[in-house]
């Protein structure tokens, strides 16, 4: 077979695959254009100028977005994209930050257990002493004061940078963050250790945990262009924890993402905004709608405080003291609005901060229905006194994707509806990017 015939057959095969794939994509997409609308409260006409966009993906080859108005006019429109090549969702760098634990667990073979320091030296010595006389299937344990064997909390930080279909992982050197934060475990904290030998005698299982409490955290760092921002919440540590020994003091920290190896440079870590840990009950940091500006939220004596932090100058641009909360609210960002969702009992409430003349202004307050689930991929939009809020949620009665939408104005809720798109919870179908919500532009 000559090379021209081989090339011809390859082109035919690609054409067949492409046409077949487009037919499959079209079939999948067309089956999901229909939107079922349920008006649960209020008047759907209040939502006529609202536009909702649902993005979905099937098997990394078919993408489609359906945009519709809750009122049904104009009719839903769907844009399709199909590719023979894989089109995985766009991914961003993210960081995981954990620590503050007085706990650890290991399972190791007898040889590894006796020769490798899988725990801090003093704890490893204690574990080996407990295991020394154990027969197969037996366990031994003890309690001790934390300061007798370990003095400072451990921390771990990992940065995952997207590279093609995978991620490159960068971590901090062992004990490097412990040396930076230098947070002592409170004296008098009781810790238990148990060691169990397997039935065949070949393995040891060690568990270290606090007595009468559970401490520690595992959360995301805030990754921007060149930096990872971190915070430490007193709510994640035992009562009485001392933060005064942190290098640079307690506050907002950042560490550069740039590195010549697979280790993050803890030596370049900075405390960029000093804060008083005695005033703070909880804290979180996130990106804002503007490049180079972060949102820093703190709970201080029961009141929520919002700061806008400028990365370039390391200064606070704006500072607001808001409502009272017993726990940190969920934050939903829109183009010109910041929505705070509270899960405090007995009811869920919201506060909308609208951007006016370069400032956030508390504009609307209300109560959301008590649901058994946390709001998933929420979106918010505001225009001329009307606040729209939407969230994806599993439908309890029918298969499909349920999306709930609320609209409020100064007088209260004016619309609450649910929208279903059939069969969207199939295994091969998933939301490729968050739900988008907007008001129709004037004259559009």
Indicate residue ranges for each PLM-predicted region.
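Hydrophilic extracytoplasmic domains
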Residues: 307-444
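Hydrophobic membrane-insertion alpha-helices, especially the h-region
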Residues: 3-25
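Extracytoplasmic/periplasmic/luminal assembly and interaction segments
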Residues: 57-106
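Short, solvent-exposed loop/turn segments at conserved positions within beta-propeller repeat blades
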Residues: 239-250, 299-303, 344-348, 397-401
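Long, acidic/polar, low-complexity amphipathic helices and coiled-coil-like
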Residues: 95-290
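Short extracytoplasmic/periplasmic juxtamembrane "stem" segments immediately C-terminal to an N-terminal membrane anchor
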Residues: 35-52
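Short coil/turn segments that connect the beta-strands within blades of beta-propeller domains
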Residues: 225-227, 290-293, 335-338, 384-385
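Residue position within the beta-strands of beta-propeller blades
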Residues: 125, 229-232, 296, 339-341, ...
